[in-house]
Design a protein with these regions (language model features):
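Helix-loop boundary and gating motifs at the non-cytosolic
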Residues: 9-67, 226-231
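Structural signature of the two symmetry-related core transmembrane helices
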Residues: 87-102, 185
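Juxtamembrane intracellular "pre-TM" segments in multi-pass secondary transporters
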Residues: 1-22, 200-231
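Helix-loop junctions at membrane interfaces in 12-TM secondary transporters
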Residues: 104-116
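Cytoplasmic helix-loop-helix junction between adjacent transmembrane helices
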Residues: 117-154
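Transmembrane alpha-helix termini and helix-breaking/packing motifs in multi-pass membrane transporters
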Residues: 49, 160-180
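C-terminal membrane-cytosol helix-exit motif in multi-pass small-molecule transporters
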Residues: 186-206
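Residue-level signature of mid-helix packing/kink "hotspots" within the transmembrane helices
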Residues: 66-74, 159
Length: 231
């Protein structure tokens, strides 16, 4: 299905670099991106207009999620090194599915913060774990094109989801927003099914002989990376 769609768009030269496992991962990611597109742009509207929280609190929740995900990111890296990207990705997708589903029922600030924490954990796990899996499944010289293709599929999915959400949601009607979050949570489960179907080696942990020395001190010394992070 994915191959036919992109070949019709003249993008078959990207597909030449993808084996069946990588295509499966990217297709699962695109389905999940459709779910994200359903809810991504409506998060503040949902909390503020539908649930009645102030705009300041709603914005603070978004900032909290970003900061919390950044803080636990080193821990996610350790887990990926220890257990492999595939396992962490599956875990993150199930966590995110629970968080998104729960968001449809929040009624108090503590509930919002609790759900936001779950969502942040899922976000922190999913992207780096997916990146590791994709890296292991394609040849080094093809990675730039493969990652570009993955981003393109991601953006396409988000765009489709945004269009669908505009057709589904009704202003001021709680049930239509809840429906969007339920649909979004299902796409995470679908993506998790794709991830489970991947071979174990797709995100295998590093062997002791492959493990290289290094620390975050070396990362912080990379001036180009720090400039990019500040930007």
């Amino acid at each position: 299905m994915l191959s036919t769609a992109f070949k019709s768009l003249g993008l078959d030269h990207f597909l030449d670099h993808l084996n069946g496992h990588a295509r499966r991962l990217i297709f699962g990611n695109m389905i999940n991106a459709i779910g994200m597109g359903l809810t991504m742009t409506l998060f503040l509207v949902y909390l503020n207009t539908i649930r009645g929280f102030s705009g300041g609190f709603s914005g603070l929740v978004m900032s909290y999620m970003a900061v919390f995900a950044m803080v636990i990111n080193p821990l996610i890296g350790i887990l990926i090194d220890k257990y492999g990207g595939r396992i962490v990705l599956i875990f993150g997708l199930f966590i995110k599915a629970v968080g998104v589903f729960s968001l449809a029922f929040v009624q108090s600030k503590p509930q919002v913060i609790a759900v936001a924490t779950i969502l942040a954990i899922g976000d922190a796990a999913n992207w780096p774990a997916q990146t590791v899996c994709l890296t292991r499944m394609v040849e080094e010289e093809a990675r730039q094109k493969v990652f570009a293709f993955n981003f393109m599929a991601l953006n396409l999915g988000i765009g489709i989801g945004g269009i669908l959400s505009a057709l589904i949601v009704t202003a001021g009607e709680l049930s239509t927003y809840q429906r969007l979050y339920w649909m979004d949570s299902i796409t995470y489960l679908i993506y998790a099914a794709f991830a489970i179907s991947l071979p174990v080696w797709a995100g295998q942990r590093l062997n002791k002989e492959d493990k290289q020395s290094g620390s975050y001190r070396e990362v912080f010394k990379n001036k180009e990376l720090m400039k990019l992070s500040r930007a």
